[in-house]
Amino acid sequence: MPEVVDTCSLASPASVCQTKHLHLRCSIDFTRRVLSGTAALTIQSQEDNLRSLILDTKDLTIEKVVINGQEVKYTLGERQSYKGSPIEISLPIALCKNQEIVIEISFETSPKSSALQWLTPEQTSGKEHPYLFSQCQAIHCRAILPCQDTPSVKLTYSAEVSVPKELVALMSAIRDGEAPDPEDPNRKIYRFSQKVPIPCYLIALVVGALESRQIGPRTLVWSEKEQVEKSAYEFSETESMLKIAEDLGGPYIWGQYDLLVLPPSFPYGGMENPCLTFVTPTLLAGDKSLSNVIAHEISHSWTGNLVTNKTWDHFWLNEGHTVYLERHICGRLFGEKFRHFHALGGWGELQNSIKTFGETHPFTKLVVDLTNTDPDVAYSSVPYEKGFALLFYLEQLLGGPEVFLGFLKAYVEKFSYKSITTDNWKDFLYSHFKDKVDILNQVDWNTWLYSPGLPPVKPNYDMTLTNACISLSQRWITAKDDDLNSFSSADLKDFSSHQVNEFLAQMLQNAPLPLGHIKRMQEVYNFNAINNSEIRFRWLRLCIQSKWEEAIPLALKMATEQGRMKFTRPLFKDLAAFDKSHDQAIRTYKEHKASMHPVTAMLVGKDLKVD
């Protein structure tokens, strides 16, 4: 088979050389907003007569490159937009196959690094100390340090990080001690070790006034002190989720499973950084109702972090399997009907994404072609929900959940510590179900994997928990003005928060509604008083799409007081599409841009066609 090319990386491919270990020594400078230090990369040649190699960098200043104590020649290539600049390093000796060399690169990041957000004290809960966090997925690790920034290469790492002594540093690794910085009594050095090989997008760092509380035998929850108690309560189910995940996926090999609750500008719901999952504070609903995100990040400890997509074209392998595991964890905890309820909700989200892109858009394919495309721009619910739908469909085709979970466990065992493509997955599926090849051959593989739009088949879903949401949404959609008095707060008295959210998702698929309906909905249900972020998000979108001017300040507030892109991007888009809030939306974006996460700022700017 031809070699799979990672079009998102400018570095030498895994077939030429492979980074085996990184030792990072760095110092965090909050005044200049830079990370500076040395990255010592242990690189193994994969061919004979290797005389030079290329690494990814982005907005890095390179001070020198040293091999065996000697400075060597290097060339920093021209910037290639979102891909950054390749650095070509000349080797002092030609390497033969499997020979290893340590390359020590002294570097400094840019204050504009796309991987880092630097927060002022005012942007934190405590208001006293600055804060730094990283987000490397998909291709931002190169904006922190020179690397082969591709998920096809896995490495172990160790680190020593110097920070102001009143702050705490954490990484996606096992904590390995702390000591005063011998070079500066006002600083402290934190040490870390990650002994499981990982793709470099899983390297992560946070520095802030962090505290922790133990919530399980292998779990501390970390945050600023203002959020610690609330977070400990919200995520108390973590250990029971981990145990179920081990039952489904095999032993948890990472040792620690800590959680970090970040400041509100964190751009994602969660990030599966090994040993330290990062999560958004928008999960702090007060009733544990958004804990499926924790189940999702836990599941990545197997699908994504152990078995990894070889390139970002195959991102669905990470996310589809992880959503599949996540929903099984929630099913074990809350019942099979609940699993089906969320599965069907996911199909609705897939419909929304396809409607947003357009049904022929290439980003609606399961396997995408990211040649000359920034993965951040292509990102959507498609790899998650189209991927899940394929696995859920296969489950139903091949004999049910137990049968398919058997496949999943075997898949994890087969491909642990490797990076794979969709073809590798499909070949293994066929070999695992070799007695059911006739059934597998009924699958319209080409449409499922490589065609845009909705899948060719919709799986079967148990409707028990969804029916109440549908019937209430249908009542509202069909109601005439005279019927509005028939609604009351009693409509929702038997609804879980998940069902309230699904009801609003149904309404949103039928937006806009007459303004009178929206005002009546607020009168009887008082949705403005609900702080659950998922419910509030859908309610405010429904209000803006139905052109309720009174909701404009509330929607602008939600779009800016947190930065989870799932919420911020659609809210800004809806506000910009409403003539009464268009100018205000653009003005608000411009005012907040400098304090937004760099990726969020870039994508909202694209959405609003600003810049």
Curated annotation (Swiss-Prot):
<dbReference type="InterPro" id="IPR015211">
    <property type="entry name" value="Peptidase_M1_C"/>
</dbReference>
<feature type="modified residue" description="N6-acetyllysine">
    <location>
        <position position="414"/>
    </location>
</feature>
<dbReference type="Pfam" id="PF09127">
    <property type="entry name" value="Leuk-A4-hydro_C"/>
</dbReference>
<dbReference type="GO" id="GO:0006508">
    <property type="term" value="P:proteolysis"/>
</dbReference>
<dbReference type="Pfam" id="PF01433">
    <property type="entry name" value="Peptidase_M1"/>
</dbReference>
<comment type="pathway">
    <text>Lipid metabolism; leukotriene B4 biosynthesis.</text>
</comment>
<dbReference type="GO" id="GO:0005829">
    <property type="term" value="C:cytosol"/>
</dbReference>
<dbReference type="InterPro" id="IPR027268">
    <property type="entry name" value="Peptidase_M4/M1_CTD_sf"/>
</dbReference>
<feature type="active site" description="Proton donor">
    <location>
        <position position="384"/>
    </location>
</feature>
<dbReference type="InterPro" id="IPR049980">
    <property type="entry name" value="LTA4H_cat"/>
</dbReference>
<feature type="binding site">
    <location>
        <position position="300"/>
    </location>
    <ligand>
        <name>Zn(2+)</name>
    </ligand>
</feature>
<protein>
    <recommendedName>
        <fullName>Leukotriene A-4 hydrolase</fullName>
        <ecNumber>3.3.2.6</ecNumber>
        <ecNumber>3.4.11.4</ecNumber>
    </recommendedName>
</protein>
<keyword id="KW-0479">Metal-binding</keyword>
<dbReference type="GO" id="GO:0004177">
    <property type="term" value="F:aminopeptidase activity"/>
</dbReference>
<keyword id="KW-0597">Phosphoprotein</keyword>
<dbReference type="GO" id="GO:0019370">
    <property type="term" value="P:leukotriene biosynthetic process"/>
</dbReference>
<keyword id="KW-0645">Protease</keyword>
<dbReference type="GO" id="GO:0043171">
    <property type="term" value="P:peptide catabolic process"/>
</dbReference>
<feature type="modified residue" description="N6-acetyllysine">
    <location>
        <position position="73"/>
    </location>
</feature>
<feature type="site" description="Covalently modified during suicide inhibition by leukotrienes">
    <location>
        <position position="379"/>
    </location>
</feature>
<feature type="modified residue" description="Phosphoserine">
    <location>
        <position position="416"/>
    </location>
</feature>
<dbReference type="GO" id="GO:0045148">
    <property type="term" value="F:tripeptide aminopeptidase activity"/>
</dbReference>
<feature type="modified residue" description="N6-acetyllysine">
    <location>
        <position position="573"/>
    </location>
</feature>
<dbReference type="InterPro" id="IPR034015">
    <property type="entry name" value="M1_LTA4H"/>
</dbReference>
<dbReference type="InterPro" id="IPR001930">
    <property type="entry name" value="Peptidase_M1"/>
</dbReference>
<dbReference type="GO" id="GO:0008237">
    <property type="term" value="F:metallopeptidase activity"/>
</dbReference>
<dbReference type="Pfam" id="PF17900">
    <property type="entry name" value="Peptidase_M1_N"/>
</dbReference>
<dbReference type="GO" id="GO:0005634">
    <property type="term" value="C:nucleus"/>
</dbReference>
<dbReference type="GO" id="GO:0004301">
    <property type="term" value="F:epoxide hydrolase activity"/>
</dbReference>
<feature type="site" description="Essential for epoxide hydrolase activity, but not for aminopeptidase activity">
    <location>
        <position position="376"/>
    </location>
</feature>
<keyword id="KW-0482">Metalloprotease</keyword>
<dbReference type="InterPro" id="IPR038502">
    <property type="entry name" value="M1_LTA-4_hydro/amino_C_sf"/>
</dbReference>
<feature type="modified residue" description="N6-acetyllysine">
    <location>
        <position position="337"/>
    </location>
</feature>
<dbReference type="GO" id="GO:0004463">
    <property type="term" value="F:leukotriene-A4 hydrolase activity"/>
</dbReference>
<keyword id="KW-0378">Hydrolase</keyword>
<dbReference type="InterPro" id="IPR014782">
    <property type="entry name" value="Peptidase_M1_dom"/>
</dbReference>
<keyword id="KW-0963">Cytoplasm</keyword>
<dbReference type="InterPro" id="IPR016024">
    <property type="entry name" value="ARM-type_fold"/>
</dbReference>
<comment type="similarity">
    <text>Belongs to the peptidase M1 family.</text>
</comment>
<keyword id="KW-0862">Zinc</keyword>
<feature type="binding site">
    <location>
        <begin position="267"/>
        <end position="272"/>
    </location>
    <ligand>
        <name>a peptide</name>
    </ligand>
</feature>
<feature type="binding site">
    <location>
        <begin position="564"/>
        <end position="566"/>
    </location>
    <ligand>
        <name>a peptide</name>
    </ligand>
</feature>
